[in-house]
From Swiss-Prot:
Keywords of the record: Aminoacyl-tRNA synthetase, ATP-binding, Cytoplasm, Ligase, Nucleotide-binding, Protein biosynthesis
Keyword Cytoplasm: yes
UniProt-listed Enzyme Commission number(s): 6.1.1.15
Listed name of the protein: Proline--tRNA ligase
InterPro entries: aa-tRNA-synt_IIb, aa-tRNA-synth_II, aa-tRNA-synth_II/BPL/LPL, Anticodon-bd, Anticodon-bd_dom_sf, Pro-tRNA-ligase_IIa, Pro-tRNA-ligase_IIa_arc-type, Pro-tRNA_ligase_II_C
Family matches, as SMART domains: ProRS-C_1 (SM00946)
Length: 482
C-alpha cells in the first residue's frame, strides 16, 4: 500500500478497494493493538461529525433532547427483559474488576442502552404531564463481534440512539414514521444514499421489540448493509422496568415505547462505498472536510508571487462566502501529486490557478464527481460554487439511485432466486412466511436472508412461495448482508 493512489477497481475487487480507500485517504489506522477497535483519523472524524450534526438537528427539530448516560450498565438491569438479555448477552463486554479488587456485581459496557434509559424513566415518568419523553444520545457502543470490518462491523462503533415514551400506542407508531422520515431527510436527501425501509420478519427483530423497521442499502458488491432502524417496543420494557404514569382520569398505566438507531458508522461506510470511484472518495460538499482546494501552478520563480497572490485572494473570498477552503501552497509536492491526493480524499471542487488564470481573470474549476474541468471568471466563481453544491449532490444521488434500482430483481422460482443471489442482487419474491423456509434459503444460498416486507405491505394471496412452493402470503426482499 505504499503507492499513492488506489490500485484496484471498485467494480472488480470491492473489498480491496474499500481497504485501500480507508487507509490511503487517511480515514482510519488499523494498527491499534486490540482487534476490532479502530483509530478514527481527522479526515474521517470531520465527515462523521457532519453526519452526527445532520441527525441531531433533525432529532431536535422533532422534540428530542440530548442526554448522556453512563457507559456501564449493571447486570441486574439486563436481567429485567428476558428476550433482550438473551439477544445481547453473548456479545457483552463485562467489567469485573477495579484495580486488584473484584467487583461485587458485573458491569456491562453498553451494547445498546434500553436497560440504562428505562431504569431512569421509571423515576422520571410519573404523570401524563411527563409525556411524551423523547431523549437521544450520540455515543459509542460495544459488542464482541467475531468478524470485524472498519465502519461496517466493529467491537466499538458510533451511533445515535433515541428512546421515546408515550401515553398511547398510536403515538408510538407515529414516532416510528417520524424516525423513518428523519432517516430519509439525512441519508437520502443530504447524503444521497438510497435505501429501503423494511419491516423485519418476526425472527429477525430487535431483541425485546414487538416490531423492527430497518433501512437497508446495497453496497457495490451486492451485499446489503443495515444503516438505520426503529423499533416498536410496545410495553415490554415498560412492564420490565415498571415505567408507568397516572393518566388524566387518575388511572395508572404503562407507557408505550420506541427506540431509534441511526448507525453513524455504517452510514459513513455506505457514503464511502457507494459514491467512491477508482480514484478514491467522492464526497458531497455538505460533509467534505475541505469543500474547495486551491492548487497554485507555476514553473518559474518569477511567476510564484503573482500566482500565490491571486490564490490568497480567492481563498479569502471563498472563506468569506462560508465555504471550507484550503490553499495548498506546499512546495515539496508537485501540482500533479496534489491533484491525485485531493481526488483520493474526495474534495468536491478543485481550483487550479496558473499564470494563464492570473492574466485572464479566470479560474480552472475541477469537479470531483464528474472529473471534468471548466474555465470560470473570477467574478462568477462564488455563484458557480453555490450551483455546484447542489449539482454535485444531485449527480451523486442520480448515480446511486440508478445503481440501487439495477440491483433489485423479481423472482418467482427457486432457481431464479439462487441465480440472483449468486450475481449480487437483492431479490423481491413471493414468500410463505415460515421461518423454516427462510432458514433453508439462507443455508442453500450461503447467506441469503429474508430482509422483510415493505412498511405498508398487507398480507394476501401471492401465488406460490418462490423458494418452497407453498402458498405465499407475503412479498419479501431477500439479500446477502454484512
Amino acid at each position: 500500500m505504499s503507492e499513492q493512489g488506489i490500485t484496484v477497481s471498485k467494480s472488480e475487487d470491492f473489498s480491496e478497494w474499500y481497504s485501500q480507500v480507508l487507509s490511503k485517504a487517511g480515514l482510519v489506522d488499523l494498527r491499534y493493538n486490540v482487534q476490532g477497535f479502530v483509530v478514527h483519523k481527522p479526515w474521517l472524524m470531520r465527515i462523521i461529525k457532519a453526519i452526527y450534526r445532520f441527525f441531531e438537528e433533525e432529532l431536535e427539530k422533532t422534540g428530542h433532547e440530548p442526554v448522556l448516560f453512563p457507559l456501564v450498565i449493571p447486570e441486574e438491569n439486563f436481567e429485567k427483559e428476558k428476550e433482550h438479555v438473551e439477544g445481547f448477552k453473548p456479545e457483552v463486554f463485562w467489567v469485573t474488576q477495579a484495580g486488584d479488587e473484584k467487583l461485587e456485581r458485573r458491569l456491562a459496557l453498553r451494547p445498546t442502552s434500553e436497560t440504562a434509559f428505562y431504569y431512569m424513566y421509571s423515576y422520571w415518568i410519573q404523570s401524563w404531564r411527563d409525556l411524551p419523553l423523547k431523549l437521544y444520545q450520540s455515543v459509542s457502543v460495544y459488542r464482541n463481534e467475531k468478524n470485524t470490518r472498519p465502519l461496517i462491523r466493529g467491537r466499538e462503533f458510533l451511533w445515535i440512539e433515541a428512546h421515546d415514551a408515550f401515553a398511547t400506542h398510536e403515538e408510538a407508531l407515529n414516532q416510528i414514521r417520524e424516525d423513518m422520515e428523519n432517516s430519509r431527510k439525512v441519508i437520502w436527501e443530504k447524503l444521497g444514499i438510497p435505501f429501503l425501509f423494511l419491516r423485519r420478519p418476526p425472527w429477525d427483530k430487535f431483541s425485546g421489540a414487538e416490531d423492527t423497521y430497518a433501512a437497508d442499502t446495497i453496497m457495490p458488491d451486492g451485499r446489503v448493509l443495515q444503516i438505520s432502524s426503529t423499533h416498536d417496543l410496545g410495553q415490554r420494557f415498560a412492564k420490565a422496568f415498571n415505567v408507568t404514569f397516572l393518566d388524566k382520569d387518575g388511572k395508572r398505566k404503562y407507557v408505550w415505547q420506541t427506540c431509534y438507531g441511526p448507525g453513524i458508522w455504517r452510514i459513513t461506510a455506505a457514503l464511502i462505498a457507494i459514491h467512491g470511484d477508482d480514484k478514491g472518495l467522492v464526497l458531497p460538499m455538505n460533509v467534505a472536510p475541505i469543500q474547495v482546494v486551491i492548487v497554485p501552478i507555476y514553473y518559474k520563480e518569477s511567476d510564484k508571487e503573482r500566482v500565490l497572490e491571486k490564490c490568497r485572494k480567492l481563498e479569502a473570498m471563498i472563506r468569506e462566502a462560508g465555504y471550507r477552503v484550503y490553499l495548498d501552497a506546499r512546495e515539496e509536492y508537485t501540482p500533479g501529486w496534489k491533484f491525485n491526493d485531493w481526488e483520493l480524499k474526495g474534495v468536491p471542487v478543485r481550483l487550479e490557478v496558473g499564470v494563464r488564470e492570473v492574466e485572464t481573470g479566470t479560474v480552472t474549476v475541477f469537479r470531483r464527481d464528474l472529473r471534468v474541468k471548466e474555465k470560470v471568471a473570477d467574478s462568477e466563481l462564488i455563484s458557480h460554487i453555490r450551483k455546484l453544491e447542489n449539482d454535485i449532490l444531485e449527480e451523486l444521488k442520480r448515480r446511486a439511485k440508478e445503481f440501487f434500482e439495477s440491483r433489485i430483481v423479481t423472482a418467482t422460482r427457486r432457481e431464479e432466486v439462487e441465480e440472483a443471489l449468486r450475481s449480487g442482487k437483492m431479490v423481491k419474491m413471493p414468500f410463505c412466511g415460515r421461518e423454516e423456509c427462510a432458514d433453508d434459503l439462507k443455508e442453500a444460498t450461503d447467506g441469503g436472508k429474508v430482509r422483510g416486507t415493505e412498511i405498508d405491505f398487507k398480507e394476501g394471496d401471492y401465488g406460490r412461495c418462490a423458494w418452497c412452493g407453498a402458498p405465499a402470503r407475503l412479498i419479501v426482499y431477500v439479500a446477502k448482508s454484512y
